[in-house]
A protein has these predicted regions:
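Conserved class I S-adenosyl-L-methionine
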Residues: 107-113
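A short N-terminal interaction module
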Residues: 1-81
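Structural motif corresponding to the C-terminal cap of alpha-helices
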Residues: 102-106
């Protein structure tokens, strides 16, 4: 596991999310969802997001590295974006979301033992 790659991925994801958040005038969590959609299908007019998504793909992150990058991103979101008590994530919900994201973002031929 390469912590520099995790830090780079976190930085790219955060820049993308904040750029989308400003462009769409939405909250951090909605912008994060849009960032993931733009990363997966490549449809965006935002040059920063295109460039950062390309750099993210070039990093070739493992599932564990994706998990850690998103874990830090969710921690940042929790610090900057207040949630109502009824909308806060439970540990199980966070686990399900991160597992889903890893399955979508990681290459299917990678296997960690």
């Amino acid at each position: 596991m390469n912590f520099e790659k995790i830090e780079q991925a976190y930085t790219y994801l955060l820049e993308n999310t904040q750029s989308i958040q400003n462009e769409l005038s939405t909250n951090f969590y909605d912008a994060l969802i849009e960032q993931n959609a733009m990363y997966l299908n490549g449809n965006t007019d935002l040059d920063l997001v295109k460039n950062n998504s390309k750099k993210l793909k070039e990093l070739g992150l493992s599932k564990e590295e994706w998990r850690r990058a998103y874990q830090f991103l969710f921690m940042k979101a929790a610090q900057t974006e207040p949630l109502q008590a009824n909308h806060q994530f439970t540990p199980d919900a966070i686990g399900f979301i991160i597992t889903f994201l890893i399955d979508q973002l990681a290459k299917s031929d990678q296997l960690d033992v």
